[in-house]
Structures are given as structure tokens and as C-alpha cells.
């Protein structure tokens, strides 16, 4: 569980109510940010269409009032069965900061287990950088961008079902950050032009599956 989420008193009780459901390997709670539903959980993985997100059927676009089977959730209070850990193993520690949860969900679903989102199991999520400007917020988070680009490029390369997903999806992502850095560097303290080769290295490390913490 991340240190920026706080379970409600009955959160675990609500999760455990579904622990006996057949085939369920992971139970995921509902997170609330300032009292509003906050979710990046999704229904399925897109591993074939390179110009669409890897994450299909986002719950953020749906009204969910009862437990629903999903394919991906965050490492923020999820409940994992012991047999899943014994079969699938531990999360990949080399996927530092980003995508370790997505990778683990992929492996869990591939092993034949279900992931269940339980909307009555509530956790409160803390909001960071709420009063910062765009430049200040991105400057604080910039050190994470390398891992975000690299790890997402790795996921697409490792699990993608065709050449386009393996290479183009990650390329599209890194080009976006390169363009932001190129055009904002003269006017904002968020990025510098020297960040551009770092972003490119993140992409190439990802498709070469070079992981680990720098």
C-alpha cells in the first residue's frame, strides 16, 4: 500500500467479503480524492492497437455501483491472495516507481486469476502539488519521467502482440515529452533542452528491456 492512501475503518472487511469468490486473485478498493472517486482501474489490456492506450475500458468513464471484474489496478491497497504470490511471484522490483502494478496485474490475469474492483471498500488518497503552477509541479516530478517513459516502453515491448505496439506506442509517448521539453524549456523552469537525450535514453532502455533504478 502506498503511503499516500488511507483505508477507511471497514475497508479490509469490505474486501474480504469477496475473498471467497471463485478465481479471484486480487481485490481492489475504491479510492477517493477530496471525497470524489479517483480511479485509473480498467477493464482490459490493449496489446494490439498501437495508437490507442494500453488501458481499455477505464472505470473513470463508468458508473460502478457493484463489484466488477477488471484487468488492472494500482498498488494502492489491493488485496492479493497468497496462492497468486506463490504462482506468479513478487512484483518486479526493477520496475521502479512506475508500471510495477500494471506488470503484476498482467501476470496475474495471464495466470488465470481474476481481479475484482470492490466499490464499497473505500480508501482516501492524499493530493500532492495541489497549489503548484504547471512549471513547478512538473519540475518536482521530472525525476520520475525517466522511469515513466522507460517502464511504459518496456511494458509495450515485452507484452505487445505486434511490432507496432512493441515500438511505436512507446515512441509516440516519448516524442510527446520531447516536444514539451523542446518548446517549454525557454519559458519554463520545468524542463531543459538537456532533458531531451535523457527522455530518448529512457525509451531505448525500455525497448531493450534494461530496467533497474539509476
Region locations from a protein language model:
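Conserved donor NDP-sugar-binding/catalytic core segment of glycosyltransferases
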Residues: 9-43
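Active-site donor/metal-binding and catalytic loop motifs
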Residues: 118-137
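A recurrent flexible, glycine/aromatic-enriched loop bordering the glycosyltransferase active site
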Residues: 60-80, 102
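Alpha-helical elements of Rossmann-like donor-binding domains used by nucleotide-donor carbohydrate transfer enzymes
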Residues: 10, 14, 103-107, 151-154, ...
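Non-catalytic, C-terminal membrane-associated alpha-helical segments of glycosyltransferases
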Residues: 161-214
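A short, conserved alpha-helix in the catalytic core of glycosyltransferases
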Residues: 78, 84-89, 94-122
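The conserved acidic donor/metal-binding loop of glycosyltransferases
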Residues: 2-6
Amino acid at each position: 500500500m502506498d503511503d499516500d492512501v488511507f483505508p477507511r475503518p471497514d475497508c479490509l472487511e469490505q474486501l474480504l467479503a469477496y475473498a471467497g469468490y471463485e478465481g479471484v486473485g486480487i481485490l481492489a478498493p475504491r479510492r477517493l480524492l477530496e471525497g470524489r472517486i479517483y480511479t485509473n482501474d480498467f477493464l482490459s489490456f490493449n496489446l494490439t492497437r498501437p495508437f490507442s492506450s494500453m488501458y481499455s475500458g477505464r472505470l473513470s468513464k463508468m458508473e460502478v455501483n457493484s463489484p466488477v471484474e477488471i484487468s488492472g489496478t494500482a498498488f494502492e491497497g489491493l488485496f492479493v491472495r497468497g496462492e497468486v504470490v506463490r504462482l506468479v511471484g513478487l512484483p518486479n522490483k526493477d520496475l521502479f516507481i512506475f508500471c510495477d502494478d500494471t506488470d503484476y496485474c498482467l501476470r496475474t490475469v495471464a495466470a488465470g486469476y481474476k481481479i475484482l474492483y470492490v466499490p464499497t471498500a473505500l480508501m482516501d488518497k492524499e493530493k500532492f502539488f495541489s497549489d503548484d503552477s504547471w512549471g513547478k509541479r512538473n519540475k518536482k516530478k521530472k525525476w520520475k519521467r525517466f522511469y515513466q517513459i522507460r517502464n511504459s516502453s518496456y511494458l509495450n515491448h515485452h507484452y505487445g502482440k505486434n511490432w507496432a505496439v512493441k515500438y511505436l506506442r512507446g515512441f509516440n509517448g516519448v516524442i510527446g515529452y520531447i516536444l514539451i521539453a523542446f518548446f517549454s524549456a525557454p519559458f519554463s523552469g520545468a524542463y531543459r533542452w538537456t532533458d531531451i537525450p535523457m527522455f530518448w535514453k529512457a525509451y531505448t532502455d525500455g525497448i531493450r528491456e534494461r530496467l533497474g533504478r539509476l
